[in-house]
Amino acid sequence: DMFEPMARSGIYTRQQHATRVLQFATSNDQTFYVRSEGVALASNSHTTRTPNVSTTTGFDNLATAALSPTSYRANRISMRQFRNDRAQICNIIADELWVPIDLEPRAEEILYSDKHPDSAENRINPEASARRPTTIKVAHHWTDTNNWCLMNSVLRKRNQVWWERIRPQYRTIGDFDTFQIKVGGRGRWGTMVLDW
C-alpha cells in the first residue's frame, strides 16, 4: 500500500510522456521527435530529400477543421493520397481515430450512427458499415479539445517506438533503531518517432 501513490504517479508520468508526441504534434517540440526537415510532426511543410520531387500535394498531414463527418471523411481521403519520398501515392488507410476525452461522444456519433449524424435527410452513414472499421482511441492527456487525428495502427506501431530501459522498480529501506522507512522508485523509458 505504501507504494500505491508513487506507482500511480509513475504511471501518470509515463502516460504523459507517451502521449507527448501527439499533444505537441503541431509544434516543433523536439523532446521525442527530431527531423532533418525542422518542421512539426503534423505540418503542411514536409519535404523530401529526393531531388526533383514536387511536394505540392501529398506531403501535408496537418488538418485544422473541427471533428465532423465531413472533416473526418476529407482527412481519410487525404491520408489515402499521402506520398512517399519519391512522390508515389502510399494509399495509407486510417483505422484509428485519436480524440481527447471531450470529443469521444462526437467520434462515436460519426463512426457508429446508422444514419448520417448531421443530416435530417436520412442518408446512410458510410462509416457505420465500413469494410475496415475505425477504432476510437481516447488520448486522456490531451488538453486541447480541438485536437484529433487519424492514424494507421500498423504504421503507428512501426514508427513510434517506445522502450523501457528500466521497468518501474520500488523498494524500501528501514532503520532498525528509529523504525523510519524510506520508500523509493525509479524507471527509465523513452519514445521516438521515426517518420511522419
Predicted regions and their residues:
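Catalytic micro-motifs at enzyme active sites that drive phosphoryl/nucleotidyl and oxygen chemistry
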Residues: 18, 84-85
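Long, contiguous amphipathic alpha-helices that act as assembly "spine/axial" helices in icosahedral shell
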Residues: 1-29, 97, 183-185
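Sequence/fold signature of self-assembling virion shell proteins
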Residues: 38-84, 91-96, 102-196
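Glycine-rich, mobile lid/loop segments that gate access to catalytic sites or pores
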Residues: 14-50
